[in-house]
């Protein structure tokens, strides 16, 4: 017959949740960093294309 398990303590539950949140925050910060880096590279490429078009005209 199934017996209910003991309840997980609040501190243990919060500890696990905080560990998960730290992992998610770390991945989100990395994704944001990569997105900003790509955006800056894109802007640099557009600026160099505009400069080369002005000099060739």
UniProtKB/Swiss-Prot annotation:
Family annotation (Pfam families): Ribosomal_L32p (PF01783)
InterPro entries, sorted: Ribosomal_bL32, Ribosomal_zn-bd
The keyword Cell membrane is assigned to this record: no
Compartment(s) where it occurs, according to its Swiss-Prot or TrEMBL record: Plastid, Chloroplast
Keyword terms: Chloroplast, Plastid, Ribonucleoprotein, Ribosomal protein
Gene Ontology BP annotations: translation
MF term (GO), any: structural constituent of ribosome
Source taxon at top rank: Eukaryota
Disordered: annotated span: 1-21
Signal sequence bounds: none
GO cellular component annotations of the record: chloroplast; large ribosomal subunit
Family recorded in the similarity comment: Belongs to the bacterial ribosomal protein bL32 family.
Protein name: Large ribosomal subunit protein bL32c
Source organism: Stigeoclonium helveticum (Green alga)
Record lineage: Eukaryota, Viridiplantae, Chlorophyta, core chlorophytes, Chlorophyceae
